[in-house]
Each structure stands twice: as structure tokens, then as C-alpha cells.
């Protein structure tokens, strides 16, 4: 039993791939089998592949049917003998001649009808709605053609052999009828499999599949009828004909039943295998695609190649992935407009008006001489320059886990400590300011900017109305950073911070800054001590005018070496 289960479990792999099995299960191809090629395959190569598969599948199926029929007519029902008790010109002339003619005419007619139905694929164009619906009928037409040829053979041979001996009549009707139905159904399923690439293109235009049976239930019941119904009917008819016409011995009756049962068992096994594989493959494709989505890959859609409910499953997966892609696009745009941290906070909890007190550090950056910059350059060049300028700022702010809260013309405001809490927001802000100053000096020497850094308590939250609001920070540190940025434009370093900001910084960061003079910023009552990167702070010639004459006495510049500054 374990060996049988293992064999059954691995059988579908023989259809999926011809390559040896490795330790890792190969990924299911887009059409469910490597035999059908890739989606990117050229149309000409796909036509050759499909035509070859159809020809081989139909010929092999019918050759096997002829072999089984010969066994039934000669071994299962030996009397009367089709060789000894029938005219030789029938057994060695009519029958072989009909088989050859049926193969030739059948192959020609099926090839022509298939090519006509798939003309759009040969011409490498998108099918119309009617052409797409016609493509779904190809498997049914193939099955009906095969059934017609077997039915014609049954009628012709029954009449000819019946004229020689009436006992041939039920034998030929029964044998040819059963084999014809099984062969036609096998050709139907194999043709449906081979035409999956064409069905996928037809489904893209929205055509409704038209087939012999509808849905998974219809397909399953059809195979059940052939695998279980036909053998049972065959055994019952054998018993009836034996009692009525043949009068077989017990041994001969047993041989007849076994010969009738064995081929139908094999054919039934093959049909059930094909049915199980046709059903499982779309599910496996969707399952593997779900695994890719779970890993964050939303790049690919499934090829919808099944006309049953499984095709609706594939279509539903594509709609789901498109929705996820749209959601990611909206999330990306939202994050670009308001900042990744604000977007993440909005996803975690429903946004509401109001805010909370936070300890943050603020970096304000503004271009020096922006009016002259705008008037001296074309508008397109100014936009490109501003984009490069803001790219430097955004890169460094993101690198230090800050939030670019606003773009105001040629200025920007970055916040550290809101909405994401930071253990040392001063360190992050000061390091960001230094990095921006260094990069602007090296990468954009034509664009100089003043940079101000301040820290303290602010109110951070959503400001506006219920219909339209934005996340921002309000408080004295924001105003102080803006005034320091304005003052920094007159210093060679272009970067100033307050000594209060350095009080909250680490010793490692403080060692990179130098204390300067004490000033009273415009709009402020209390003086503050300026700091700037080490060995860069210099007093401007007309700084008294800039700070409103409140500079006071010149302070001695000292290098800060680890001790916290005091006013």
C-alpha cells in the first residue's frame, strides 16, 4: 500500500516535466506544464508545439483503440472468428483500408478545421469575440470527429460482417461503440490540455467557454461515466449476449470479461489521471503564486487557461493581486506626500485631529539667495536644481530616521522624534545637519543653504479640518530653527545650532561642535549661545544688523570637547 500511494502521488510530475526530479519541487509553469512551453515563446514555435502534440495524442489514442478492438474481436469473442468465418477480402481488405483512409482523412480534416478555428493565432493577432468562442469548440469538434469515424467503422463493419454471420452484429456494435466513446473522450481531454495557450488568449478577450461539459462537476461526471459506467454496462451486455447469442463456456466468459475489463481499467486510470491533473494544476499554480505574494512579490499575474471554475479562481487571484498592487501604489504615494512614518502611523491607528507633547529636534534648511536664483535661471532649470537639493535633504533625513515634514518653496523642515520616537533626537538632527552641509558643499556648490538646528518640547499631531488635515509640529523649537537658519546664511559654515540642543546630545556628537557667541534671535526675548561644527564658526562682518543689534559683546570661540555647554 505505501508503494502504491507513493506512485500515485508522483504520477502528475511525469506530465509536468520531463527533467529529472531534484530535491526541490520545480515551480509550476504558467500553463501548468513544461510541455506547453512558456508565455514568452514565439507564436510560430507555439503553433508547431501544439500541432505536434495534437497529432501525436490523437494518433496514439486511436492506434491503442484499434489494438484493444482487435483483442476484443479475436480473443475475447473467438467464435465466430473474424478470420476464419468471414470473407478474407473484408478482414484483410476493407478493414485495413478503412483504417488507413480514416487516419489520413481524419488527420487532414482535423488539421484544417483546427487551423481555421485558430486562424487568429496563426496570423498573430488578438482574436475577436466570435473567434475566441470558436476556439473553445475545437476539443468538442475533435471528439465528435473521432466519434464519427469510430461510429462509421462500427456501422460499416457490422453490416459487412453481419452479412456473413449475424453473430458478428452485437460483437462489432458493442466493441466499436465502447472503444469509440472512450477514444473520443480521451481525445477531447488531451486536446483541451494541448490548447491551453490558445484558451488563455481567448479568455483574455472575455469570451465565455463553450465545451462538451460545463465546469468541474460535468468534467468529473463524464470521466466517471467512462471509467465506471461503460465497464459495468459492458459486463452486463456481455452476460446478456452470451445468454442470447454466443453461449460461451465459463472459462471463455471469464476471459471475455477480463479482456473487456483490463483495457477499460487502463483507459479509465489514464482518464482519471488526466482529469486529476487538469484539476490540480490550476490550483497548484494559484498556490505557488500565493506563496510569492506572501513573500512580497506582486509583480506577476497568472495566465488564465482554464474555462471551468478553476479559471474563475485564477481570475480572482489576478483581481486580488491588482488590488494589492493598487494598494501599494497608494501607500507609496501617501508615504511620499506625508512621509513614511506618518503614513505608517495612519495605518496603525485611525488619524484624528489634535496632538501630543513630544521632545523633538528640528532641522530647518533654506537656500541662500533664492530670489536671485529664480530670476537668473530658466524655470525648468530651477526645478531640476530644487529637486537635486531636496534629494540630498530627504536622503540624509531618512538615513537618520527623521521625517521631512514640509517643503516650503526652497526651504524644508525635518523633525526627529515624531511621529517615531527616538532615544536621542538631538544626535540624529545634528548628524543630519552636518551631513547635509557637507553634501551640499561637495555635490551642489552652486546652491548654498543655511541650516538651523534646535530641540525642545513641541505639540505633534494632525492640524486642519476633518475633511483635510496634515501632520505637523508646533512649538518654539520650530521657530528657533527657522531663525538659526536665517542667521546661518551669514556664516561661512552655513550651519548653526543652539547650545540648548547640544545639552541633549551625546558626548560623541558634542565633540564635533564648537561654541560661539551669545545672540538674541529676532522675535525672541532670551539670548542663546550659538554652536557650529568644529573650527568653522566665524563671526560675520554685519551680524549685528542680522540679529537686530542684540549680539552684545564678542564671545571667545572655544572648541567643545565633551563637557556640556553652558550659557
Curated annotation (Swiss-Prot):
CDD domains: CHD, HAMP. One of its GO terms (cellular component) is plasma membrane. It is found in: Cell membrane. One of its GO terms (molecular function) is adenylate cyclase activity. It comes from the Bacteria. PROSITE patterns: GUANYLATE_CYCLASE_2 (PS50125), HAMP (PS50885). Pfam families: Guanylate_cyc, HAMP. SUPFAM superfamilies: HAMP domain-like, Nucleotide cyclase. Residues 361-485 form the Guanylate cyclase domain. Residues 1-26 are annotated as: Disordered. GO terms for biological process: cAMP biosynthetic process; intracellular signal transduction. Signal peptide: none annotated. The chain crosses the membrane at residues 57-77, 90-110, 142-162, 173-193, 221-241, 257-277. Coiled coil: none annotated. Keywords: Cell membrane, Membrane, Transmembrane, Transmembrane helix. InterPro entries: A/G_cyclase (IPR001054), Adenylyl/Guanylyl_Cyclase_3/4 (IPR050697), HAMP_dom (IPR003660), Nucleotide_cyclase (IPR029787). Belongs to the adenylyl cyclase class-3 family. This is Uncharacterized protein Rv1320c. It comes from Mycobacterium tuberculosis (strain ATCC 25618 / H37Rv).
Amino acid at each position: 500500500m505505501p508503494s502504491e500511494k507513493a506512485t500515485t502521488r508522483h504520477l502528475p510530475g511525469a506530465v509536468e516535466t520531463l527533467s529529472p526530479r531534484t530535491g526541490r519541487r520545480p515551480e509550476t509553469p504558467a500553463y501548468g506544464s513544461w510541455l506547453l512551453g512558456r508565455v514568452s515563446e514565439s507564436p510560430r514555435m507555439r503553433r508547431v508545439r501544439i500541432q505536434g502534440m495534437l497529432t501525436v495524442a490523437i494518433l496514439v489514442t486511436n492506434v491503442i483503440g484499434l489494438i484493444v478492438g482487435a483483442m476484443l474481436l479475436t480473443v475475447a469473442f473467438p467464435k465466430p472468428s473474424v478470420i476464419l468465418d468471414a470473407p478474407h477480402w473484408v478482414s484483410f481488405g476493407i478493414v485495413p483500408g478503412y483504417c488507413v483512409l480514416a487516419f489520413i482523412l481524419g488527420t487532414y480534416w482535423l488539421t484544417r478545421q483546427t487551423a481555421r478555428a485558430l486562424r487568429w493565432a496563426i496570423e498573430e493577432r488578438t482574436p475577436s469575440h466570435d473567434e475566441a468562442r470558436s476556439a473553445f469548440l475545437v476539443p468538442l469538434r475533435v471528439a465528435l470527429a473521432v466519434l464519427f469515424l469510430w461510429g462509421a467503422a462500427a456501422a460499416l463493419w457490422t453490416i459487412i460482417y453481419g452479412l456473413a454471420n449475424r453473430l458478428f452484429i452485437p460483437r462489432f456494435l458493442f466493441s466499436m461503440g465502447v472503444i469509440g466513446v472512450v477514444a473520443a473522450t480521451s481525445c477531447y481531454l488531451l486536446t483541451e490540455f494541448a490548447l491551453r495557450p490558445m484558451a488563455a488568449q481567448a479568455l483574455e478577450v472575455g469570451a465565455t467557454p463553450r465545451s462538451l461539459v460545463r465546469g468541474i462537476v460535468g468534467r468529473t461526471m463524464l470521466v466517471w461515466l467512462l471509467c465506471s459506467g461503460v465497464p459495468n454496462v459492458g459486463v452486463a451486455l456481455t452476460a446478456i449476449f452470451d445468454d442470447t447469442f454466443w453461449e460461451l463456456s465459463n472459462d471463455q466468459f471469464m476471459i471475455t470479461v477480463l479482456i473487456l475489463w483490463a483495457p477499460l481499467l487502463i483507459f479509465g486510470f489514464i482518464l482519471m489521471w488526466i482529469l486529476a491533473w487538469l484539476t490540480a494544476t490550476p490550483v497548484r499554480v494559484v498556490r505557488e503564486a500565493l506563496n510569492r505574494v506572501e513573500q512580497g512579490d506582486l509583480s506577476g499575474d497568472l495566465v488564465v487557461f482554464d474555462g471551468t471554475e478553476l479559471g474563475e479562481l485564477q481570475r480572482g487571484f489576478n483581481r486580488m493581486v491588482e488590488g494589492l498592487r493598487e494598494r501599494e501604489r497608494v501607500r507609496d504615494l501617501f508615504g511620499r506626500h506625508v512621509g513614511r512614518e506618518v503614513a505608517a502611523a495612519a495605518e496603525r491607528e485611525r488619524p484624528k485631529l489634535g496632538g501630543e507633547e513630544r521632545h523633538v529636534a528640528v532641522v530647518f534648511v533654506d537656500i541662500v539667495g533664492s530670489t536671485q536664483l529664480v530670476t537668473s535661471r530658466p524655470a525648468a532649470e530651477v526645478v531640476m536644481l530644487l529637486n537635486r537639493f531636496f534629494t540630498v535633504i530627504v536622503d540624509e533625513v531618512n538615513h537618520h530616521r527623521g521625517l521631512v515634514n514640509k517643503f516650503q518653496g526652497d526651504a524644508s523642515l525635518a523633525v526627529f522624534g515624531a511621529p517615531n520616537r527616538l532615544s536621542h533626537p538631538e544626535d540624529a538632527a545634528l548628524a543630519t545637519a552636518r551631513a547635509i552641509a557637507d553634501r551640499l558643499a561637495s555635490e551642489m556648490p552652486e546652491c548654498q543653504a543655511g541650516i538651523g538646528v534646535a530641540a525642545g518640547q513641541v505639540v505633534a499631531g494632525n492640524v486642519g479640518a476633518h475633511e483635510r488635515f496634515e501632520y505637523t509640529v508646533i512649538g518654539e523649537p520650530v521657530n528657533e530653527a527657522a531663525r538659526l537658519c536665517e542667521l546661518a546664511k551669514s556664516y561661512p559654515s552655513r550651519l548653526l545650532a543652539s547650545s540648548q540642543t547640544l545639552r541633549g546630545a551625546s558626548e560623541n556628537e558634542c565633540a564635533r561642535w564648537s561654541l560661539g557667541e551669545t545672540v538674541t534671535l529676532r522675535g525672541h526675548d532670551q539670548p542663546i549661545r550659538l554652536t557650529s561644527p568644529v573650527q568653522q564658526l566665524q563671526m560675520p562682518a554685519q551680524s549685528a544688523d542680522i540679529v537686530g543689534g542684540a549680539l552684545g559683546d564678542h564671545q571667545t570661540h572655544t572648541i567643545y570637547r565633551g563637557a556640556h555647554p553652558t550659557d
